[in-house]
Curated annotation (Swiss-Prot):
Stated name of the protein: Apolipoprotein C-II
Region annotation Lipoprotein lipase cofactor: where it falls in the sequence: 78-101
InterPro entries to which the protein is assigned, alphabetical: Apo-CII, ApoC-II_dom_sf
Species this chain originates from: Phoca vitulina
Posttranslational mods: Proapolipoprotein C-II is synthesized as a sialic acid containing glycoprotein which is subsequently desialylated prior to its proteolytic processing. Proapolipoprotein C-II, the major form found in plasma undergoes proteolytic cleavage of its N-terminal hexapeptide to generate apolipoprotein C-II, which occurs as the minor form in plasma.
Subcellular location: Secreted
Length: 101
């Protein structure tokens, strides 16, 4: 999944870079471009809202309280274990870096 986010980030930066380096347009073209950008933005917000509503509806349909409790319990146990092992690793690393003093 990290590659997808990186690809999206690169594409967004590329588009923004091209926009910054683009030639200056006459005033009339800027107004047309602005309205096109506004339409595109409104369209994207509409799609985002639709996807968000569909995801919320799907979540509400499949919500199981027992599963939610199990997930919370697993999360709590795993974070406790990770924090314990991270503490042990940190102590070992610090003792290696300090050496015999």
């Amino acid at each position: 999944m990290g590659i997808r986010y990186l690809l999206v980030l690169v594409l967004v930066l590329l588009v923004l870079g091209c926009e910054v380096q683009g030639a200056h347009m006459p005033q009339q073209d800027e107004a047309t471009s602005s309205s096109l950008f506004t339409q595109l933005q409104e369209s994207l917000y509409g799609y985002w809202g639709t996807a968000k509503a569909a995801a919320q509806e799907l979540y509400e349909k499949t919500y199981l309280t027992t599963m939610d409790e199990k997930i919370r319990e697993i999360y709590n146990k795993s974070t406790a274990a990770v924090s314990t092992y991270a503490g042990i690793f940190t102590d070992q690393l610090l003792s290696m870096l300090k050496g015999d003093q």
